[in-house]
Every structure is written in C-alpha cells, then in structure tokens.
Amino acid sequence: MGAGATGRAMDGPRLLLLLLLGVSLGGAKEACPTGLYTHSGECCKACNLGEGVAQPCGANQTVCEPCLDSVTFSDVVSATEPCKPCTECVGLQSMSAPCVEADDAVCRCAYGYYQDETTGRCEACRVCEAGSGLVFSCQDKQNTVCEECPDGTYSDEANHVDPCLPCTVCEDTERQLRECTRWADAECEEIPGRWITRSTPPEGSDSTAPSTQEPEAPPEQDLIASTVAGVVTTVMGSSQPVVTRGTTDNLIPVYCSILAAVVVGLVAYIAFKRWNSCKQNKQGANSRPVNQTPPPEGEKLHSDSGISVDSQSLHDQQPHTQTASGQALKGDGGLYSSLPPAKREEVEKLLNGSAGDTWRHLAGELGYQPEHIDSFTHEACPVRALLASWATQDSATLDALLAALRRIQRADLVESLCSESTATSPV
C-alpha cells in the first residue's frame, strides 16, 4: 500500500509538467507574425520590402508582386499593403534621391527656397538686411536665421548667405576717415608726408616711444630699400633709428613712369607699322608697268632729238611687232594683275557695255558661287569689284580669263585682250 501511494504521488507532478508542455507547444504553433489567417487556419504570409500585396489572403494564401522601379515602391513588410506610387518632384522642388522599389523619391526645394513644415510648399529664404548677418543658413526645412551685427562687425549688403564681417582696423601709418558701423566698414587713409620711426630704447629703458619728424632726402638706395621693406629697422643694433616712408607715396611716380613708357612705346610701334606699310605700298606701285595708253591716231610723237614720227605710220610699219606681242600675250600664262591699267579698264568697259548678265556668267566661270556674285552688286562698279577680287587669287592668270571668256561666247573680249595697245617708242 505504501509503495502504491508513493507512485500515485509522483504521477501528479508529471502530469502537470506534461500539461504545461503541451500548452506551450500549442501556443508556439498558433503564433502568427501577421495576425491574419486563411479560411483553413493557415497564417497569412507578409510581402517583403520592395513587394506589394497583389491579392490578400483569404481563401488562398497572400499573393505578392514586385514594385516597379521609379513608378511604385513599398517600404514596409506587410500582408495587406500594396505598392504605393512614387512621389513626383514638381514646381520649385528638385529630386535629391530617386524612387526605387523599396524607397520613395526624396524631394527638396531649389536653391534659395526651403520647405515650410506647415504647408509643405517651397518658400523663398529670408534675406538678412544690411546691418544683419547670417547665423543659420536656409536649407531643407529651415529658413534663414539672421542676427544684428554686434560691435566690431558690419554687413553692408542684403543677402541670405553672408555673416557679419569684422571691421577694418586702421594701421599706425593711417588715419580713420569713417568709423565702422553695423551697416558700413571703417575707412582709412594713408597719412601723407610723415615719417614713422621706432627707435631702439637705451639700455635700462622699459618702453619704446614712437615719434614723427619731417623727412630728409634719403639716398636713392635707401629710398628703394624703404619702398620694398615699408617698415622701420635698426642698423647693426645702433640706437639711431632708420626711418622709412609709406610705400604709396614712393610707388606712384614709379607707376606713372611705367605707364608713360608703355604708352610711348605703343605709339612708336603703331607709327613704325604704318610707315612700313606705306613704304611697301609705294614700292609696289613703282614696280608696276608704265601705263602705255595709245595716243590718238595721227598724233606726232616727239623724241629728245626733235624728230617727230606719225603714230599711224609707225603702226603701219610694225604689224609684225603687234602680231608677235599678241601671240605672247595670248599664251604667256602671266597674271591678270600684270596687265597695264589701261588694258584692264578697257576690259571693264566692254563688260559694262554688255548685257546685264554677262559679267555674272563670267563670275560663274571663274569659280564664284551665286551668293558671292550677288555681293558684287552692292559695289559701285560690280565688274571692277569682280575682277579686283579675282586678281588676288593665285590662279588669276590671263589664260584662265581668256578660257572663261571663250566659254561665255565673248570672242570680242578675247580679241581685245590679245591685241596689243598701240604704243610707240622714241626714235
């Protein structure tokens, strides 16, 4: 009996332990993170970051779908939330971070604006007026914070970026023309005609007393040294002070001398260039062939010997000379610019006396484009402008001009160019 009672006493705690273990296992099995269950009692699963619920659980398990980059996003783990549309930055907003599957876009106001927390709109930053300076800059959701400039500082400009600036302190060699205020800096001026000295105190003296005195003319080397140094020094420990003058008074004559030298040199250079150009033009004019215009028919040519010759009879006596010259002119391949001025004027007159489009056809044969040809019509004499422009080219040979005239059926001009101008030489 005693053993049976003891066994039953041991079964009580065992039964209680088994009961508690079963309850805990049952509770662990029933725990569901989402707190949602299907109709069959299965725990509904949640969609991860970057995924949204396409079909919530009910009769079936939860169906998830990925969010579209730059279109939708999901930044929570949920069994009910679908993908949300991305925020668009509009108006005064600019995008500081793009919209991705797991994060929305981040917008911020443009420079000079901040986002008002109450309205959510971009507002213009506050401007610190003159006499006030920046304490905290305007950015994100914070407006500009300004303060009045304290003593020793100033701000002479209204803006939202600059703090109060420290006032200028005049040097010992300067005098103050205007005090520094909250709105304007101090203004200093160099003291003219004064020497500032600092002497080494005698042995046993505790202080150095600055003094001023009228200047004496220093040697040239000392003046240059004082201009460069600009400070008072003591030579070899002597108690005699070495005085220097402000650099401004000494440098002004130097600057003026340099400026005058530059101006004179520039004027001389321009004059030399113009003289050289005129000289070259004069030499070029002298090297051109002499204008040999034909004298009127029957005019008498006089030589230094006093013998007169009839130009018409001379022309009749020398036909072979003209023929040879014409052949040389026709095929020598020389430049058009080497023709006598009278011959070029004759060609211009013949072209001017022709039909209105003759010179245009010639310009086309010489290689000019229509727009360039039209530009010659603005000149007083289009034909002269055309031939002068063409004569500057390396290809402006007489053969090229003759070939172009033949192509436009102007044999009369070809004959005129190939015929020698009537000229006589003294007998």
From Swiss-Prot:
N- and O-glycosylated. O-linked glycans consist of Gal(1-3)GalNAc core elongated by 1 or 2 NeuNAc. Residues 29-250 are extracellular. GO terms for molecular function: amyloid-beta binding; calmodulin binding; coreceptor activity; death receptor activity; nerve growth factor binding; neurotrophin binding; signaling receptor activity; small GTPase binding. It is found in: Cell membrane; Cytoplasm; Perikaryon; Cell projection, Growth cone. Residues 273-427 are cytoplasmic. SUPFAM superfamilies: DEATH domain, TNF receptor-like. It holds the Pfam family TNFR_16_TM. The keyword NAD does not apply. SMART domains: DEATH (SM00005), TNFR (SM00208). Changing E420A: Decreased interaction with ARHGDIA. The chain crosses the membrane at residues 251-272. Residues 326-341 are annotated as: Mediates interaction with KIDINS220. It is a single-pass type I membrane protein. The death domain mediates interaction with RANBP9. It also mediates interaction with ARHGDIA and RIPK2. The extracellular domain is responsible for interaction with NTRK1. Low affinity receptor which can bind to NGF, BDNF, NTF3, and NTF4. Forms a heterodimeric receptor with SORCS2 that binds the precursor forms of NGF, BDNF and NTF3 with high affinity, and has much lower affinity for mature NGF and BDNF. Plays an important role in differentiation and survival of specific neuronal populations during development. Can mediate cell survival as well as cell death of neural cells. Plays a role in the inactivation of RHOA. This is Tumor necrosis factor receptor superfamily member 16. It comes from Homo sapiens (Human).
